């Protein structure tokens, strides 16, 4: 549905233009409260066309079923899964205001690999604090838990992990990084192949991302959910309903205390469970170069680096999906980028039009069509 504010009577075009000119400053919602709301017309949208986009989204909800699809697609489950999920839901922001929303946007569900972009953002804090001197440094220089002892793994840098080019070898939480074996990996199993040097080959690989997550937890000396909550989610006014889970067997000892190492997705259960409204806040933070009102929470330089394509990935940055070649989403600007997860789930960010679009539980092939319709609704 179009946001209730859209039901106001139409105003003359000069008044709309004046409204747009007056709202050059981005609106940042306070904790638990997203107001004042603006109508689509006041935000530069054609209300009828925006309603068409919402109708398209509602017609393209996911058919994903945890009981039917999870194990056969991904293999043996290691962590929690919800008993049921919400239906498709989402939010369209412009200039920080809600232009449209649909479905239950307060349903905190797993977002699968959207969590990877959160790991990237948490890593930025380690760099800013000097815990990581340079992303080109070998991880082994910082982490001595046996995971980087081999001559091959000793070459892996933080940047290799960030770009999914680590080629880390080993087993973590009962899953081998080679993804060989249907029991453990379901339809996602892969054939054995030659391992390449770190930094020379891209492979989307959750075992290696989970290794990266564990390394960051050891570096911070605490669980990543604690870091995320204290340094990112609380400052942007996120709700208390989100949770970031690991696996039933992923608890380690750090500084003499048990810490659950969290996963970079929900492929084997666990992962980040979060609602569309909190995802929209996070997306708004990223859209505004890491700044929330007067506070610089994430380094703007980090975000520039994170949204620059790697040498070997499929238009991929630091665990963010890019569109520099306009292959991901042909109807989207080259500057747009996204956090993507199975299900499907996304945070799509469009700096050219100052838009954040969050979509929970949609058919993967529908995203470009949805983007096309959102942008067709933009008038100015």
Model segments located where?
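Active-site-proximal alpha-helical segments within enzyme catalytic domains
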Residues: 117, 208-215, 270-291, 345-361
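N-terminal leader/targeting segments and the immediately adjacent pre-domain N-terminus
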Residues: 15-104, 129-132, 218, 222, ...
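Active-site helix/loop module of the DD-peptidase/beta-lactamase fold
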Residues: 129-168, 220-269
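Structured C-terminal helix/loop/strand segments within mature extracytoplasmic catalytic/sensor domains
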Residues: 338-380
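Active-site-proximal loop and beta-strand segments within enzyme catalytic domains
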Residues: 32, 36-38, 58, 63-82, ...
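Active-site SXXK
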Residues: 46, 96, 110-135, 161, ...
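Active-site Gly/Thr loop motif
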Residues: 240, 245, 250-266, 308-356
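Catalytic-site signature segments of enzymes, centered on catalytic residues
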Residues: 98-106, 168-248, 270
